[in-house]
């Protein structure tokens, strides 16, 4: 014989906590280790967004990310086409590796960003600096690539160690973002 259970309504009162503070994120430290156009812009856009939202933003560039903050390369970054699975997925790697294709892809990307009124890299750094953001270069990577303070954009505040970088991130409400 099968027993049946009576259905009884279940009611419960659940208190939902009300957020007293606007946000717990007070500052961001964005570490950029890559020097491709899309990675550098991701870091710049996130830092700018944090600053516009009233948060502190600091950028730390290391290894190939240093290309983004050198006077020589800042406005000449490229989009990686070979080995980038997100770049036109249906395109064979052979086509993406053809001479001139990376330059063409970078040109098209910059053209689309220009349509959206996204500033060039050096102008973006100037905006971030003017809004109170701070830009740093990694000491070890700078030494490895034989770069000096004079090689970097004027907006680069200093060349610092990894320990110094962690000190920048110290405190409650601090978030590290690695690109």
Predicted regions and their residues:
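N-terminal beta-loop-helix "entrance" segment that forms/cooperates
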Residues: 65-78
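Histidine-anchored nucleotide/phosphate-binding helix
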Residues: 41-54, 59
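A charged, amphipathic interaction segment
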Residues: 104-163, 167-168
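A hydrophobic membrane-anchoring alpha-helix module
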Residues: 173-179
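Short, glycine-rich nucleotide/cofactor-binding loops
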Residues: 29-40, 69, 112-116
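Positively charged, low-complexity intrinsically disordered leader regions
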Residues: 2-21
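Short internal beta-strands
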Residues: 57-63, 136-139
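A glycine-rich helix N-cap at a beta->alpha junction
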Residues: 77-109, 113, 117
